[in-house]
């Protein structure tokens, strides 16, 4: 990935994104953790070591007995996170095209999809039933418009729109992974540390979504971002 010397965003230079892209050790750490945990939340059986080996061609680690889907999920998530970085570097903005490209990247070689879903979907373990497919385009149009014009507290905004995105469930597959990538898009755009939702926190995370608890989710995301900043400091981030 080509790195710009200075990355400008909302309110000035995106120092944190600049640090991530210039610090190869932290970049690999973030991509591997984000990929491993986001996929594990959705049921992937890859270990952390297997995920790293797939993402960075570590031939010293032998991977056996894994479904091709899981391998593609790892590769695709890395590519999608890099797409987030590229969007921010180029200041391409938050629009329908970007969201669709993220989801298409997540599903590459697994479930080839183009655009929003055309079938009814259901969320396992949730009483909420996402809207009918014919309603999705308009819902997403309003979602994107409101998102781009919302100036509330950043963590409150992220939590509200993450829950709304997951309730719309605009795609046939990959909604969770896409939604979590969008969280980090908004954090980095605002020069805030990214977050990694650990697979161990899967139940807690899903409870926020099931209960439509944007206040609780906002507070938790703020804690995760602060925790990530402490980790970044171990890689040389000065704050």
Question: Positions of the model-derived regions?
Answer:
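FIC/Doc superfamily catalytic core
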Residues: 1-173, 177-239
């Amino acid at each position: 990935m080509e790195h710009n010397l200075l990355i400008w965003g909302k309110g000035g230079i995106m120092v944190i994104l600049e640090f991530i892209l210039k610090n190869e050790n932290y970049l690999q750490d973030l991509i591997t953790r984000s990929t491993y945990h986001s996929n594990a939340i959705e049921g992937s059986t890859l270990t952390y070591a297997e995920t790293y080996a797939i993402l960075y061609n570590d031939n010293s680690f032998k991977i056996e007995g894994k479904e091709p889907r899981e391998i593609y999920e790892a590769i695709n998530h890395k590519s999608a996170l890099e797409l987030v970085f590229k969007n921010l570097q180029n200041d391409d903005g938050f629009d329908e095209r970007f969201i669709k490209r993220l989801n298409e990247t997540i599903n590459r070689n697994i479930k080839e999809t183009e655009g929003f879903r055309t079938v009814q979907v259901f969320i396992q373990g949730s009483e909420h039933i996402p809207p009918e497919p014919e309603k999705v385009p308009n819902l997403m149009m309003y979602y994107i418009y409101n998102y781009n014009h919302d100036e509330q507290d950043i963590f409150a905004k992220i939590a509200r729109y993450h829950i709304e995105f997951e309730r719309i469930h605009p795609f046939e597959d990959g909604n969770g992974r896409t939604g979590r990538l969008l969280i980090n898009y908004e954090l980095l755009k605002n020069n805030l540390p990214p977050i990694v939702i650990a697979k161990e926190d899967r139940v807690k995370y899903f409870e926020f979504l099931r209960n439509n608890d944007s206040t609780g989710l906002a507070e938790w995301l703020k804690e995760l971002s602060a925790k990530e900043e402490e980790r970044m400091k171990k890689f040389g981030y000065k704050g």
